[in-house]
Amino acid sequence: MARAQVTVPLDIPDVRVLKTEINKVGELIITIESTKEGTICRQCGREIRKRHGYEEWTTIRHLPVFGRPSYLRYRPRRYQCMECEGHPTTTQRLDWRESNSPHSLAYDDHLLLQLVNSTVEDVSIKEGAAYDCVLGVLERRISVSVDWGQYTALGVI
């Protein structure tokens, strides 16, 4: 008898799913590739499109699927700038992930929602994520200062 399958949209722009698998501990691993062409040169700021290989494989946490933790696995593309001296390479930045974050932006949003009326410790336990990972979401996504210059009036609730 064939195993039943369900298709779940990732809702991530500019990616193609290459493979899905469930590892030994029951986590869903989704191998993807970017379909976005080009990136911005880290030195001159121009758009560059000359491919120059790939970074190492990267695995980041994504939204849970049917109660299972899921991870996105991909190799970021590298591009070379032919205008700058030394022809430096730049890793493609993706709209759905912040640089150096262990999570997708969608998972960051999920964790922030879980933090409503909960502590960092509570969310860490519920999600099976390290305390520092949950704290990192707060530090990356929530501003600790207010730009009062953007407000002309404060209303009364």
Where are these regions (language model features)?
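Short, conserved DNA-binding cores of transcription-related domains
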Residues: 1-86, 91-94
